[in-house]
Amino acid sequence: MRKNACCFTGHREIPPEDREPLRAALLSEIQRLYAEKGVTEFYTGGARGFDTMAAEAVLKIREALPVRLHLILPCKGQSDRWHFAEKRRYREILKQADTAEFLFERYTPDCMLRRDDTMVARSGYCVCYLRDPAAKRGGTAYTVRRAKKEGLEVIHLIPVEVEQLTTL
């Protein structure tokens, strides 16, 4: 666990009314983590939705502050089935990231969870967008539970009691 590092986890689908407030919250939280906690390393998994928003927020903040964006990607070809606009954003983020690491050559049944585990292992903080704290399934719920178990400070961009989350 690294105290100067933070990972992001959140849903792929974000309701339209949440998008702008979420972008603002991400920018604010990244700046706060840098100023108050000395966080300079930010990890995202490169998925659609929240991961993309988080990566773009780090890149925006990087224009003014010495922060770095690291992509931990589950497999090559992750974006193959995405829509054209999503693929374009993904490629742009890949080009601008400080590092990009593919964990597997091709998709495996557990590659997404291994990506999540890797980000948690490299971080001291986890910023999340989790709409249902009682969720027992899904990558976001899994990653938040894992982060809590590993002792990371979990920061919810939607107020949720971490204790409400079920154990791994």
Whereabouts are the PLM-identified features?
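Acidic/glycine-enriched connector segments
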Residues: 1-168
